[in-house]
Swiss-Prot record:
Requisite cofactors: Mg(2+)
Binding site for Mg(2+) 2: 132, 187, 194
Name of the protein: Gamma-glutamylpolyamine synthetase GlnA2
InterPro entries xrefs: Gln_synt_N, Gln_synt_N_sf, Gln_synth/guanido_kin_cat_dom, Gln_synth_cat_dom, Gln_synth_gly_rich_site, Gln_synth_I
SUPFAM superfamilies, alphabetized: Glutamine synthetase, N-terminal domain, Glutamine synthetase/guanido kinase
Function: Involved in the catabolism of polyamines. Catalyzes the ATP-dependent gamma-glutamylation of polyamines. Substrates include putrescine, cadaverine, spermidine and spermine, with a preference for short-chain polyamine putrescine. No complementation of the L-glutamine auxotrophy of an E.coli glnA mutant. Together with GlnA3, enables survival of S.coelicolor under exposure to high local environmental polyamine concentrations, which is toxic to the cells.
BP GO terms, sorted: cellular response to polyamine macromolecule; glutamate metabolic process; glutamine biosynthetic process; polyamine catabolic process; putrescine catabolic process; response to starvation; response to toxic substance; spermidine catabolic process
Pfam families the record matches: Gln-synt_C (PF00120), Gln-synt_N (PF03951)
Keywords for the protein's UniProt record, in alphabetical order: ATP-binding, Ligase, Magnesium, Metal-binding, Nucleotide-binding
Effect of disrupting the coding gene: Normal growth on defined Evans agar supplemented with ammonium chloride, sodium nitrate, monosodium L-glutamate, L-glutamine, 200 mM putrescine, 50 mM cadaverine, 25 mM spermidine or 25 mM spermine as a sole nitrogen source. No growth in complex LB medium supplemented with a mixture of 25 mM putrescine, 25 mM cadaverine, 25 mM spermidine and 25 mM spermine, inhibited growth with high concentrations of spermidine or spermine (100 mM) in the medium, but survival of the cells with only putrescine or cadaverine supplementation of the medium, although strongly delayed growth with cadaverine.
Co-factor: note: Binds 2 Mg(2+) ions per subunit.
Length: 453
């Protein structure tokens, strides 16, 4: 055993931990778990735990279903809601084939593969997500309209703000697991919260996002609430995004920073943004993977909701412009390490492993191909007419999942990044979701048409 594995075994004994949950995600980003006893963990480190891959969305067909979950000891943490003895801990797993080779179906491996290519180019990829979600009073039944847990608004600090106690307990849990939080506050809509995680390497951040979602749901359950990461659960309120700040480092140097350049943004940073823009439409099915995702992007309320409700609809960048798809935040003098770009289209229901992989691939393509960055958007992009946007070369994002899938299907970049297995399954699964949605007769249609037609 190596030192990390020895630390895990020793901690289990010292803290009387009786269960270890081994976590991984399916292709769509749903968390999976298998529990093992501490006595089995040494063998799990050596050989992994076998399971039926055909039972996991997108993993394997029934006639080739044997797969192995091998725990990554660097991700070991004690679960804070099982802190009383005997306790429970968790580790994320890498998914392997029976011969020990990585499974191409594993979203974590998709990101690892992209990060390995990044490392070969001399870069380290860092991400920092701002995660929005709603707290609901109770679980809606049979598609009924949900009820927000409070009526507070952006940055509100009021006695009836249920979110304050919720966020305090949730952040305490996160930090006890080594997940650092930068900020938290009430967002713009009733019941809507935002918690921002501190910068970390992209793989750690993706693991942290998955942990974050479970912690939020666990704390909500304990408080008699429901936490949802659905992109847009309310027609009348802004949706929930996962705006993510990205940066590349070469060793200790921020590759996006250049003293004296416009916005202190280096050529590497400019080409990275150009890559994000050029490939934005074709990666949208990954960054915004649900039918409901496009209600957030094109829902209308985003444009008038004020603070916290600015979901981008058009492909452009801007300096400190929150109507743009990619924002270059204001540079803080003396803080060269803080140079970064913010991608604002991602929603809270995205699979973070696949999302970070395609964002990275798009940005690196811009660097490798020397893409030129178009002029930035200086105005409120939503306030422009279609003709004005066309004159500026500003194109729209896909308007629905069907459009996004058609663009993804033709994308060599997405196919290469996800790999054939994940790419094919993702398209099949999402086409089915789109067709099921298109065939529904909605409450809107019945309300508008049934009485008069």
């Amino acid at each position: 055993m190596d030192k990390q594995q020895e630390f895990v075994i020793r901690t289990l004994e010292e803290r009387d931990i009786r269960f270890v949950r081994l976590w991984f995600t399916d292709v769509l980003g749903f968390l999976k778990s298998v529990a093992v006893a501490p006595a089995e963990l040494e063998q799990a480190f050596d050989e992994g735990i076998g399971f039926d891959g055909s039972a996991i969305e997108g993993f394997a067909r029934v006639y080739e279903s044997d797969m192995i979950a091998k725990p990554d000891p660097s991700t070991f943490q004690v679960l804070p809601w099982r802190a009383e003895a005997p306790g429970t801990a968790r580790m994320f797993c890498d998914i392997l084939m029976p011969d020990g080779s990585p499974s191409f179906a594993d979203p974590r491996y998709v990101l690892k593969r992209a990060l390995a290519r990044t490392s070969d180019l001399g870069f380290t990829f860092y991400t920092h997500p701002e995660i929005e979600f709603f707290l609901l009073k109770d679980k809606p039944v049979d598609g009924s309209v949900p009820t927000p847990a409070d009526n507070s608004g952006y940055f509100d600090h009021t006695p009836q703000n249920i979110g304050m106690d919720f966020r305090r307990q949730a952040i305490t849990m996160l930090e006890s697991m080594g997940i650092s939080v930068e900020f938290s506050h009430h967002e713009g809509a009733p019941g809507q919260q935002e918690i921002d995680l501190r910068y970390a390497d992209a793989l750690s951040t993706a693991d942290n996002v998955m942990t974050f979602r479970l912690v939020m749901k666990q704390v909500a359950l304990e408080q008699g609430l429901q936490a949802t990461f659905m992109p847009k659960p309310f027609s009348e309120y802004p949706g929930s995004g996962m705006h993510t700040h990205l940066s590349l480092f070469e060793g200790d140097r921020n590759a996006f920073y250049e003293s004296g350049a416009e916005y202190q943004l280096s050529k590497v940073g400019r080409s990275f943004i150009a890559g994000l823009l050029r490939h934005a439409a074709e990666i949208s099915a990954v960054t915004n993977q649900w039918v409901n995702s496009y209600k957030r992007i094109w829902g209308g309320t985003e444009r008038t909701a004020g603070a916290g409700g600015e979901a981008p609809s058009y492909i452009c960048w801007g300096h400190n412009n929150r109507s743009a798809l990619v924002r270059v935040p204001m540079y803080k003098p003396g803080k060269t390490g803080s140079a970064r770009v913010e991608v604002r289209s991602i929603d809270s229901g995205a699979n973070p492993y696949l999302t970070y992989a395609v964002l990275l691939a798009a940005g690196l393509k811009g660097i490798e191909e020397g893409y030129e960055l178009p002029p930035g958007a200086e105005d409120d992009v939503w306030a422009l007419s279609d003709a004005e946007r066309r004159a500026l070369g500003i194109e729209p994002l896909p308007q629905n999942l069907g459009e996004a899938l058609a663009l993804m299907e033709r994308s060599d970049l997405v196919a290469e990044t996800l790999g054939e297995h994940v790419f094919d399954f993702f398209l099949r699964n999402k086409r089915q979701e789109w067709e099921e949605y298109r065939s529904q007769v909605t409450a809107f249609e019945l309300r508008k048409s049934l009485p008069v037609l």
